[in-house]
């Protein structure tokens, strides 16, 4: 099982988001604990030799890295689709 960590940007976004949207996003992110690369995630590139994935959550997107050696999923950024990239 993996541990899900949020970057400061991701935490700040969730703090400003409405409660029902925040709950929906957090529920989807919890699923990454069991399977860090689900079939509905997409590889979008590399940063510092680490793969970056996109996870779709309705109109929102979460960008994240999987750190296999320490079993951590690091959520880099969460935002609406046009702004996340």
Regions found by a protein language model. Give the residues of each.
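Enriched for short, Lys/Arg-rich terminal
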Residues: 1-8, 12, 20-23, 57-60, ...
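A generic "cationic amphipathic patch" detector
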Residues: 23, 27, 38, 45, ...
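A short, surface-exposed loop/turn module that caps and links secondary-structure elements
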Residues: 30-54
């Amino acid at each position: 099982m993996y541990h899900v960590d949020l970057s400061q940007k991701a935490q700040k976004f969730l703090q400003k988001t409405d409660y029902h949207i925040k709950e929906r996003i957090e529920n989807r992110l919890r699923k990454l604990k069991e399977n860090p690369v689900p079939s509905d995630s997409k590889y979008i590139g590399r940063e510092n030799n680490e793969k970056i994935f996109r996870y779709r959550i309705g109109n929102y997107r979460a960008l994240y890295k999987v750190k296999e050696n320490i079993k951590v999923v690091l959520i880099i950024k969460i935002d609406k689709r046009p702004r996340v990239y």
